[in-house]
Amino acid sequence: MSIPGFGGTNGSLASDSSEFTQISIPPANEWRIEVPFKKLLKLKVTLGTLEINGSELPNNVELQLSGVKLPIYAPPSINKEHAKVEYKLVTNPDQSVLLSSEDEEFTQYLSDETNMDLVVNLAMYIESKRQIAKDLKTNEGDHALGPRVLILGGKYLGKTSLAKTLVSYAVKMGSSPVLVNLDPKHGVFALPGSLSATVINDSLDIECANGYGFTMTTTGSLSKSMKQPVVKNFGFSDVDENVKLYTRQIDQLGIAVLSKLEGIEDGSGSEVDGNHNKVRSSGVIVDTPPFTMKSFDIISSIVSDLKIDLIVVLGNEKMKIDLTKKLKHKIEQGSLNIIKLSKSPGVVDDVNDRFIRMTQEQTIREYFNGNHRIRLSPFKTEIDLPSSSSSASASASVSSSSSTSSSGLVIYKSVLTKEYESSMAFLPSGDDFEHITNEDENGGDGNDGDGRGIVEDIKEYYQILEDPNSSNLDNSIVAITHLPLESGSSSVTNGASGSLNMSSKRKRELLNTSVMGYIHVSKVDDEKKKMKILLPFPGVFPRNVLIATSIGYNE
């Protein structure tokens, strides 16, 4: 039996002779579990209703979870019947996981302390705002914009779990909200190091790494169940690595999201939902990295770029008060409301960096190889190493029998702010930076695609990777953008003080482009000038601009 988002076993697990253990979960209680990566938890709901982050678990279907710390919630029932689960712990057959130095063990316990009643009330309040949006019509006959919800808070408060729950409850009630992920540590329908926005119209896949699901960029499939995200490259896991690039990508993601709500093609390569009225009234749920009031400038940008009208502050009364003061003008205008929600008593507050890194590796591994339920066939090939002297030329089809000629490829990299500032410190006094001006040399108006003039230094965002080699590309993730290479043009290089000798129009295109997909560079042969890469599926290697990220991965 197979249900989208909930797959049965396929017999590939390591055999285990242990018997299933049964546990009874009272209504309005949580069964809290922590499953290490070296183990697999096989479980089956045999009676009643249970949820993981708002996604209802099917009865009598075996599920598999690994590397998770989460609660399984039993909603209140009229007859007060206990839900029942059978579970068994087995060794994870994934050898790459077994080779890790993880020392965590499986833990589980029941608790009647939960904030789910507050979460349900919040979900119903948001749904009431969606209904109001459906009832209100624009001059064009469209629904009004639905609620745009921003979830804020510090570390280990359950922001991501809340975002998943609100999205899942919205889908249950017939809505299709846009889930926006602004935490580059997570790969939400994308890989770590990215920001994404995805229309959610069916259940999240709790068995997938991070508990989201597959995308068409992974499988090459246009299956209805595959999500089609808008993905912006950031290239780092930590926002502080380049705050300017981060806020600029939020701005561009905001344009894409609002275009999607308007039913306008946004140029990102993501298809506009045919039923944009439903998406429009369903609104937006925004998940964020840990923020404090020191990050207010970023928070303010998010509120403006995504037209946020409801901020949910998790577990921090002081932050709620400070935000109310800072955003008083919006509150008085009636365009913004700020509420505080108590954090779940079951939030795990000892998640270490190693667990986060292993979760990232699982996300990347699943992107290329799939999981126990959906097996993917990643494609390995060898291509020419880009060089600073290469000119744009036609790409060839990826073939297992020969290397792909890719001498026209150009690889950029996201700029680490501290490295950029260090390089600027050595400039002679009075030297200016190369800026994108309001009137470029090609006669453009300097507009950034949304009618606004921009004046900024592109060197603060991207630089060309002038000397691609094993030291800077081995075991790395590279983003393939939607931006085509310029055919017949001369090569792009870093000029004086790292400037890019390309037109202002081209620089804007680079800054505004979205991510089509990813490749993994497993090894670079510096002598032969070749690099071995892994693609999610066979096909024509895109003749598009590439951006190297700081996200590493070993097969």
UniProtKB/Swiss-Prot annotation:
Binding site for ATP: E30, K69, Y156, L157, G158, K159, T160, S161
Major localisation: nucleus
Nucleus found in the keyword field: yes
Molecular functions per Gene Ontology: ATP binding; polynucleotide 5'-hydroxyl-kinase activity
GO biological process: mRNA 3'-end processing; tRNA splicing, via endonucleolytic cleavage and ligation
A GO term from the CC aspect: mRNA cleavage factor complex
Family label: Belongs to the Clp1 family. Clp1 subfamily.
Cited HAMAP family: Clp1
Protein name: mRNA cleavage and polyadenylation factor CLP1
Protein's organism: Lodderomyces elongisporus (strain ATCC 11503 / CBS 2605 / JCM 1781 / NBRC 1676 / NRRL YB-4239) (Yeast)
